[in-house]
Each structure stands twice: as structure tokens, then as C-alpha cells.
Amino acid sequence: TVRGTYSSCRVDQEEYIRWYDREDHAHFDVCADDHCQRYQGISKAYTPAVREALEATRGEVLTYEGTICDARFSKCCGGATERFDNTWEPVVHPYLDKITDAPEDLETGDLRDEQTARKWILSFPPAFCHTTDRQILSQVLNDYDQETQHFFRWQVSYPAEQLSELVYRKIGIDFGTIRDIQPIERGVSGRLIRVKITGDKKTLVIGKELIIRKAFSESHLYSSAFIVEKQDGIFTFHGAGWGHGVGLCQIGAAVMGARGYNYKAILQHYFKGCELIKMYE
């Protein structure tokens, strides 16, 4: 059973910080949206390959210091994974920290620094998840997600009027015409934790990553690892990765598998210090 928390707070009417867990589906452990892990149901996920993998690993559990791991995952980390506590409640899981998604450590610098994050987001490092191999992607993405051509690095633009209306509709806060979007705090992967939105009616800092992604997209922005450029009344978001970036990178893991890494090596790559143990037959 998945148990979680929900938090929403305002600080002197200057901040709106929220993270999500189970409040939107109290009668179910998971839902089929970015809110959870986009669980698509047993009818879509339970293929012969999945059955084979389940049987081969029956009774195996990923643990950290004797405790079962909270083994989070996202579609594409963009080359670097994020800390759990930067995304959800302020709980530190040592195995859910930053790693670079490559055979050898990538030199990223401190991605909490704005100029370093900008350089990283605009680059195309040789990460496992930097792939366009359709066969590999078909193992991870369902049919409609495969229509997405650019997810390792991506771009989306909005006129100021359209963006202002979108933000109001998606999070219910009327900024008026949005004049500026400023990064306030980034996590270790470069993902934004807090963003300051300045409009002609209101200025407010919002967070965490999911509310940021929700605010700037009809569904969810690919990730909160982005920079914003404004020119001639157009806001352009340049971003990295797809999803919250915590834990296992699904596309990176698929590439690792295609290159001959076994599942134990893949888990050790994404969940540092964890151990697979056999709990039952």
C-alpha cells in the first residue's frame, strides 16, 4: 500500500508551495497520471515479457539498510537525477540523490547554480537516456507517448497573453498579464523547486516541481529543469528531461539493458547503496 502526504502553504501571501501524493485518489494506491507513476493498468502493462520478468525476480526486494526502498522512477532524467526531498515531502532517502546517467560520471558542475544549470540544459551530454532508438523507446513509451520526438532536450513557446490565461486556468491564480518568470531555487539536477511569477496583478513564488509543470502546460510540462527566455512578448521554455527525475530513469535503464547491463547492475546504478535480497520464494 502506498501511503503519502499532501502539503499546501502560503507564506505572507508571497509563496504557494505544494507537493502531491494521495489526496486526489484516496481510494487507490496509484493513478494513471504524472501525479503518480502514470500506471496504465494491468491490461496494458501485463505482457509476456513482464510476466517473465516477474517470475524471474519473484521474492526479490530492493532494500537500503534493511528497509524496503521507495523505488521512484521517471521517463527521462535528462542526464542527472533529482533528490526525493526536492520533489516531495522533506524526507531524505540517501539512495534517491543525484547520479549522472552515464557509464562514467558526467561533469555537470553544481546544477543548483543558475549559470551552470543554463549551460547544462542547453547542452546534449552523452547520457544513457539521450537516445532516439525507436526500438528501445517502444519498450518504455506507449503508443501516444512515442509521438513525442524531443524529450531529452525540448522547447515550448507561449505568447504572454496565452501563458497568462493558461497559468490562471491551471492553478487558479490570476497574475494578470505575466511580465516575468524567474528561477528562485533549483535542485541538484537543475530542476526548479521554486519559481517567481511576476504579473501586473500579482507576484508570487510557486513550487514544488509538479505545480510548476502543471502551471505552464495544458497537461504537464515535460520537466521543471528549464530556463525561460523572453523576446518580443514570447516566453520560450528550454528544458531537459521528462518527469520528476527521481530514482530510476526508464529510458536510461532501457538503453542500459540494450547495452548488456543486467537488472542488478541497472538498479545499482540508479539506487546507490541499495541491495537486492530474496524475501520469499
Question: What kind of feature is each model-predicted range?
Answer:
Residues 1-281:
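Conserved, single-site charged/polar hotspot
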